[in-house]
Amino acid sequence: MAEEQAYHVNKGLECIKALRARPLDPLVVEEALAAWVETSEGQTLDRMSSDEAEADHQDISKPCFPAAGPGKSSMSRCHDQGLGGSNSCDEELGAFIGDSSMHSTEVQHYHVYDHSGEKVEGVEDADSILVQSGADDGVEVWGGDEESENSDVDSGEPDPEGSAPADWGSSPISPATRASDVETVEGDEIQKLLEDQSRIRKMTKAGKTLVVPPIPSQERPTASEKPIKKGHRREIDLIWNDGRVFIDRWCNPTCSKVTVGTVRAKCICGECPRVCEQCITDSGIENRIWYHNLADIPE
């Protein structure tokens, strides 16, 4: 199909090139237009039959379309026939312009022909394949052709392999009740499902009741529920100076952040003791300056 289309396109381009090389005589065009006006005025609707249109198209399709196939080479009749001869394409194009069916607003009938000029069989059958657009309600879909419908196989009986018969048809449903029925059914089923789930939750079985512990309250603990007081951690700092090492030991509250350097931190939780067994004997414990963080330490 693609080769035939390419073949016709090439031949059409050859005709266009020939017309550009030798344009039509203006007198021929005027005579063709005058003849068309005379025929169109006296024409009636009864003369616009399909047989006449088919005959007109047969006469038109002969000049510029050669009888050779896509694989054969042939010269178009649109070329000149010598210096003294007349251009046959001019006369035929004038007849083509004079065809009133090309300017008619009525429905045109088109026919397909092969390269020999004969009508292609089976082309008109393609019109019956077209499906009319419209509502799809009440339309049944049937599979297979006439031979399959008239076959001896009964669609109602299961096949030898045991598969169940399938109904490929569709029952007509009115559009007015289709959407409402679906919504009603879905609503009833959902409501019934919710009621069943609620009834199951209320039913308790012996020995299978799930006991969920209560959520702990966010209230502050009482005096009896206070946690154990936090203690101290021992920290050591080593300082080297001219081959000598100075060791500094101290305690910091456990709740304080561990930092680099000699930092005497301050309790931030309010529950750590001031001294412990390790730092109670440290010298200058009463005069020690407690810092909360490094920013509080003077330089």
UniProtKB/Swiss-Prot annotation:
Bias (Acidic residues): 137-160
Gene Ontology, cellular component aspect: host cell cytoplasm
Record Gene3D superfamilies: 4.10.80.340
Location of the region described as Disordered in the Swiss-Prot/TrEMBL record: 137-186, 205-229
GO biological process, one term: symbiont-mediated suppression of host cytoplasmic pattern recognition receptor signaling pathway via inhibition of MDA-5 activity
Example GO molecular function: metal ion binding
Annotated InterPro entries: Paramyx_V_Zn-bd, Paramyxo_P/V_N
Amino-acid positions noted as binding Zn(2+) 2 in the UniProt annotation, renumbered to this chain: 255, 267, 269, 272
Location(s), subcellular: Host cytoplasm
Main location: host cell
Keywords (A to Z) from UniProt: Host cytoplasm, Host-virus interaction, Inhibition of host innate immune response by virus, Inhibition of host interferon signaling pathway by virus, Inhibition of host MDA5 by virus, Inhibition of host RLR pathway by virus, Inhibition of host STAT1 by virus, Inhibition of host STAT2 by virus, Interferon antiviral system evasion, Metal-binding, Viral immunoevasion, Zinc
Residues given in the record as Zn(2+) 1 binding sites: 232, 251, 276, 279
Pfam families the UniProt entry points to: Paramyxo_P_V_N, zf-Paramyx-P
Role played: Plays an essential role in the inhibition of host immune response. Prevents the establishment of cellular antiviral state by blocking interferon-alpha/beta (IFN-alpha/beta) production and signaling pathway. Interacts with host IFIH1/MDA5 and DHX58/LGP2 to inhibit the transduction pathway involved in the activation of IFN-beta promoter, thus protecting the virus against cell antiviral state. Blocks the type I interferon signaling pathway by interacting with host TYK2 and thereby inhibiting downstream STAT1 and STAT2 phosphorylation.
Quaternary data: Interacts with host IFIH1/MDA5 and DHX58/LGP2. Interacts with host TYK2; this interaction inhibits the type I interferon signaling pathway.
Other notes: Highly virulent strain of Rinderpest virus can blocks the phosphorylation of host JAK1 kinase, thereby blocking the type II interferon signaling as well.
Family: Belongs to the paramyxoviruses V protein family.
Designated name of the protein: Non-structural protein V
Organism: Rinderpest virus (strain Kabete O)
Taxonomic path: Viruses, Riboviria, Orthornavirae, Negarnaviricota, Haploviricotina
